[in-house]
Swiss-Prot record:
GO terms for biological process: translation. Residues 104-122 have a biased composition (Basic and acidic residues). It comes from the Bacteria. SUPFAM superfamilies: Ribosomal protein S6. One of its GO terms (cellular component) is cytosolic small ribosomal subunit. This is Small ribosomal subunit protein bS6. Binds together with bS18 to 16S ribosomal RNA. Keywords: Ribonucleoprotein, Ribosomal protein, RNA-binding, rRNA-binding. Pfam families: Ribosomal_S6. Residues 96-139 are annotated as: Disordered.
């Protein structure tokens, strides 16, 4: 079996159907004895150039180990699905399991937002304590 990196773009109006599509496409590969090494749903992102007058699309990345026949079947499924705007299948030399730069950047943004949320809630708690102390002294 060979290793492949697969990226496909889904029409932004069909974003709700992406989990089902991922399940269907991974099923095609795993039924033929393939293995999914990495699966990342990057979500809706800006396109570099318009495709069919669309400026955004839903991105999905998969790194798999599969047979050539199952990858051909997957490409056929992409071709017959109108929601898939573009797809790219590249053969790689080895399995890639670490997070992609896109996923790492998203994790960093999420952790930054969480820490900012903690910082914002901390002054609010301190203000509440001061207010309670002031009310007690006023009584």
């Amino acid at each position: 079996m060979r290793h492949y990196e697969i990226v496909f773009l889904v029409h932004p109006d069909q974003s709700e159907q992406v989990p089902g599509m991922i399940e269907r496409y991974t099923g095609i590969l795993t039924q033929a004895g393939g293995q999914i090494h990495r699966l990342e749903d990057w979500g809706r992102r800006q396109l570099a150039y318009p495709i069919i007058e669309l400026h955004k699309a839903h991105y999905v990345l998969m790194n798999v180990e599969a047979t050539a026949e199952s990858v051909e079947e997957l490409e056929t499924a992409f071709r017959f699905n109108d929601a898939v705007l573009r797809n790219m299948v590249m053969r790689t030399k080895a399995a890639i399991t670490e997070a992609s730069p896109m996923a790492k950047a998203k994790d960093e943004r999420d952790s930054r937002r969480a820490s900012e949320g903690e910082r914002r809630s901390a002054p609010a708690e301190a203000t509440e304590e001061v207010t309670e102390a002031a009310e007690k002294t006023a009584e």
